[in-house]
Structure formats: structure tokens, C-alpha cells
Amino acid sequence: MFLKKRSSSGILGTLSLTGVVISSMVGGGIFSLPQNMAASASAGAIIIAWLLSGIGIFFIANTFKTLSLVRPDLKAGIYTYSREGFGPYVGFTIAWGYWLCQIFGNVGYAVITMDALNYFFPPYFEGGNTLPAILLGSILIWVFNSIVLRGIRQAAFMNVIGVIFTLIPLLIFILITALFFKFSIFKTDFWGTAPQHHLGSIGSQLKSTMLVTLWAFIGIEGAVVMSGRASNPSSVGKATILGFSGCLLIYVLLSLLPFGSLSQYQLAKIADPSTAGVLKFLVGKWGEVLMNTGLLIAVLTSWLSWTILTAEIPYAAAKNGTFPECFAIENAKHSPAFSLFITSGLMQITMLLVYFSSNAWHTMLEITSVMVLPAYLTSSLFLVKLSLSKKYPKQAPIKARVAIFTGILGTLYSLWLIYAGGLQHLFMVAVLLALGIPFYIDSGIRHDQEKTFLNRKEVMKMTTLALIALLAVFLFSANKIHL
């Protein structure tokens, strides 16, 4: 039974929020890091790539931490920061884009889960888009829906357990590769300049490797999205930094330790999940089984985490009238019931489409991954704007000048991420974001009787996005740009 009542707050502590952050970032891709990083880069270039990405993402993470401390009144921060800083339409667009991004992302987890199952039950789930894969994936969509409906606290607890079981095989991998590590192998062709396997300039190596590192941190905003349910505002910032630090350390070790046992050329040839191939080379079949099992647990855990986050955004947006009011409906367990059902329903439809067009699906997944980046940019810009205004609290635990520095660097790195996403994907993002305009207008008509949501500034923002979307449609239809 659905109940319209205020959400219970203060149910998630630092541990649960950290679990959400880690599971949001650590998906199935982490089990393929050794090969993905070594595919076109040397150990030296990989070290530089993680250093640059780590510094950049640190300022994104610190932006979220600072805002959670300075403006604890803004719940579901990644959406409310945008609304507070740049108006209702920008807030809606960020929420809309983030929601679409995670709907498609969750179906991506379903496809990856089925593909991982194929290792144990070939060939029934091969590629993740066979009929058995679609059926089982559909069942799991509604299983996760049921878990979250039983309460956010319970779902978050299960998520923490999943994170623990995900980290165990990764830590075993790190331990084994450390034991087999030989510095003489690691330093061989450290910069990838050997004539027989020349990888190009350090710059070109960095570019290819950075594209992998960029996506490794998507999900760092997990604690911020759940800030409305945090037991203490400070827990949000702590969880974000803890999750970021832990994941960065794991990413670096997973990427570099295999270079102490295998050459770059050997690592680049290992099939995904490459952690399984590395352990099979080092310790035999049991290592391969262990890592494939870990992959399955990791993907299921991330899927649960993103189910929680995906339903939370439209729920939070509906509470202040940005999304239709029905999305704010809760059940007796204080879960966003209506939002969950609509989200799961859209995931189900998308899952069925995967059966008919797997190639189109992979393209859509790349596009929607870019859709989360405007949220990082607007959050960083809001911190800069807040720090320069008189509204910045004088007694804030973080000084304004430090906040300005953090916000500026977070903004610059966000712009780099958007640039790295590619122009063709950005144009498609504009089209998908523009599809939300009718829903924004409808929601505004229902909640804003004075029609302030259609003032000149908001209309200009909508018009600009609509024109960019129309330009994108023209360029795609004229084959001027391609996905």
C-alpha cells in the first residue's frame, strides 16, 4: 500500500553510505582493468594516468564533501545543488538526465550479469542478450525492486554485505600478484618504447588510458544522492572521501601489479575479465573461477546500489515540485514506491529492446554514461558561485578560499571529462535532455500557479537546449556526425 508521508531521515550512517559509494563505482569493469589499462599503454603511462585522474576526481569528491557540510539543507545534492545554483529548469534537466542515465546503466548491469553467468552456464547467456538472459535479467529487475521496497536501510545493509564479498576476491588478486611480483619484469619497457611493441608517445598512451580511468569513478556521487537519508550531514562527505580513496588504491594496484608478472604485450592479449586470465596464468583454474565469481557478485551489488540511487532522484525532485507529485509517493517502509515501479518498468522495457538490438544498446550505454557529467559540472560551479557570494557561512568548517579553489579545479576537470566524452555523444545527450522539456512544463503548470517557472531566463535555457537538440538531429540525419 502506498502512503504519502514524509520520508524517514537519518537511517544511513557512514558505513552504509561508504558502501553505496564503493558499490556504485566498483562494477563489473574493475575485473577487466589489467587488460583495459595495458591495451595501449605502458606501466609508466598508467601511473601518470591514475595520478592525473586521481587528482581531478579528488576535487570532484571534495566538492561534494564541501557542499554537504556547507549546505546540509540541500538533500539529494547532485540534483538540488543544480537547482539552487542555476534555477528550476537546470535542476530538472540534471535530475532528468541523471535518471535516464541510471535507467540505461542498470539495464547494462543486467546484460553484464547475464554475460558473466555464461562462464558457468555456456552458451545460454552468451552476450547477455539471449532469450534466457532477457528472461532472467527481467526477473532480477523486479527482485531488486522488491528488495528496495522492503526498506532503504535493509537494502543498504545488503549492499554493504555485497561490497565485502566483492572486495574479497579483489584483495586476493592483489595479494597473489604482489607475491609473484618481480621488479625486473615490471621495469622492462617501462615507457612502451621497445621497437617490437612500440606504443607511441606518452601523450597518446595517456589519452587512451585516461578514457578508461574517467569512467572508473562514475558513482562517486552515491552518498550525495542519498544525503536526505543520512544520519549526519558529515557522514556524506566522509563516505565520499573514504569511497574515493579506497577505490583509487584498488584501481592502481589492480592495474600495476600484473606488470610484475606479465609484459604489457601479454596483458593486452588477455580476454576479459582479465583478472581471471591473470590468476589462471599465475595459480591455475581456481584463480579463474574465483575472479569470475567475484565479477558476478560485483555486478549484482552495483545493480542493487544503482536501483536505490535511480529511484531516489525522481523521488527527491518530486518533493519540491520539479517532477510530477506522484513520484514522491512512499510505502509504509518509507521507500520511494511509485518512483521504483516506474523506474523498474522503464528498465523492463529497455531490457526487452536489448533482445532485438544489442549493438544499438551498446551505443546508447556510451551516450548515457556522458549524461552524468553535467551534474558534476553544475555541482562544481555551484560551489564556486556559493563561495564567492555573501551566503557562504562564515562559521563553515571549510574556508571560502579553499572552497573556491576546490570548485574551480572541480569545474576544470568536469569540463575535461565532457570533452573526453566526444562531440557526437554530447549532441545525442542534448537530444535526450530536450525530451524532458514537455515534462518540465507539465509539472510546472501543476505546481506553479504564478508561472514563475516560465520566466525569461528559464525560457532562454529551454530554447537554447531545444535548438542544440534540433541541430544535433539535423547533423545526424545528414550524416555529418556519426555515433
From Swiss-Prot:
It is a multi-pass membrane protein. It holds the Pfam family AA_permease_2. The keyword Cell inner membrane applies. It is found in: Cell inner membrane. The chain crosses the membrane at residues 9-31, 46-68, 88-110, 130-152, 159-181, 209-228, 241-263, 295-317, 338-357, 367-389, 415-435, 462-479. GO terms for biological process: amino acid transport. InterPro entries: AA/rel_permease1 (IPR002293), Amino_acid_antiprt (IPR004754), APC_superfamily (IPR050367). Keywords: Amino-acid transport, Antiport, Cell inner membrane, Cell membrane, Membrane, Transmembrane, Transmembrane helix, Transport, Virulence. It comes from the Bacteria. One of its GO terms (molecular function) is antiporter activity. GO terms for cellular component: plasma membrane. The keyword Cell inner membrane applies. Catalyzes the exchange of L-arginine for agmatine. The arginine uptake by the bacterium in the macrophage may be a virulence factor against the host innate immune response. Belongs to the amino acid-polyamine-organocation (APC) superfamily. Basic amino acid/polyamine antiporter (APA) (TC 2.A.3.2) family. PANTHER family: AMINO ACID TRANSPORTER-RELATED, ARGININE_ORNITHINE ANTIPORTER-RELATED. This is Arginine/agmatine antiporter. It comes from Chlamydia muridarum (strain MoPn / Nigg).
